[in-house]
Amino acid sequence: MALSVETESHIYRALRTVSGAAAHLVALGFTIFVAVLARPGSSLFSWHPVLMSLAFSFLMTEALLVFSPESSLLRSLSRKGRARCHWVLQLLALLCALLGLGLVILHKEQLGKAHLATWHGRAGLLAVLWAGLQCSGGVGLLYPKLLPRWPLAKLKLYHATSGLVGYLLGGASLLLGMCSLWFTATVTGGVWYLAVLCPVITSLVIMNQVSNAYLYRKRIQP
């Protein structure tokens, strides 16, 4: 028996609510897991994985879920209020990422190791730079009068698309980090696979949210 359009809509919304809640829990759980594993303060390097997971797993995920119709924790706020919270969370994520990048550079300098010698390092640098550009672009949406010649709808579309790319770059950096000697020496077996699933799950949820909010809607418009 075929489901009615209304029933399918309710099921789809319920699935998005569940997946959004899962993204909140996974983003927080992964960050706590990395913090416990790294024991921040035990060494200079120990702050790097903590700050990067805080930036690209927790803060950036929460910054994007702010706009989720089903799972936002700030649904009571106006669109403008959520946009400002989004920008603050993104800025905090950028600051954490910059600090994490700076500390690992200092750590490598102390050990006399080469910089950007791995795909993890290159992806991480690219993700941090992209996040910086994305935060700068967000200023144009907070204050659209700064860009009077650009239609606001197009600015939102470009910002959302670019933000999704930046988020996926951050997720890729985390995945590559879990292939590093430091991580694989401590985390093995099924726990490693569960850890790898964390950024994959949050990335899929964010991709679905952005695609439905901007990309798919724009594609079906005449």
UniProtKB/Swiss-Prot annotation:
Keyword field contains Membrane: yes
Transmembrane region(s): 18-38, 47-67, 86-106, 123-143, 163-183, 187-207
Regions of this protein lying in the Cytoplasmic compartment: 2-17, 68-85, 144-162, 208-222
Function: Transmembrane reductase that may use ascorbate as an electron donor in the cytoplasm and transfer electrons across endoplasmic reticulum membranes to reduce monodehydro-L-ascorbate radical and iron cations Fe(3+) in the lumen of that compartment.
Catalytic activity, as annotated: monodehydro-L-ascorbate radical(out) + L-ascorbate(in) = monodehydro-L-ascorbate radical(in) + L-ascorbate(out); Fe(3+)(out) + L-ascorbate(in) = monodehydro-L-ascorbate radical(in) + Fe(2+)(out) + H(+)
GO CC terms of this entry: cytoplasmic vesicle membrane; endoplasmic reticulum; endoplasmic reticulum membrane; vesicle
Any one GO biological process: ascorbate homeostasis
Note on cofactor: Binds 2 heme b groups non-covalently.
Cofactor(s) listed in the protein's UniProt record: heme b
Compartments, record wording: Endoplasmic reticulum membrane; Cytoplasmic vesicle membrane
Keywords noted in UniProt: Cytoplasmic vesicle, Electron transport, Endoplasmic reticulum, Heme, Iron, Membrane, Metal-binding, Translocase, Transmembrane, Transmembrane helix, Transport
Record topological domains on the Lumenal side: 39-46, 107-122, 184-186
Matching CDD domains: Cyt_b561_CYB561D2_like
Cytochrome b561 domain span: 14-217
Binding-site list for heme b 1: H48, H120
EC number from the UniProt entry: 7.2.1.3
Classification via PANTHER family: OS05G0565100 PROTEIN, TRANSMEMBRANE REDUCTASE CYB561D2
Gene name in the database record: CYB561D2
Native source species: Bos taurus
Designated name of the protein: Transmembrane reductase CYB561D2
Topology with respect to the bilayer: Multi-pass membrane protein
Positions with a binding annotation for heme b 2: H86, H159
One GO MF term: transmembrane monodehydroascorbate reductase activity
Record's keyword annotation contains Magnesium: no
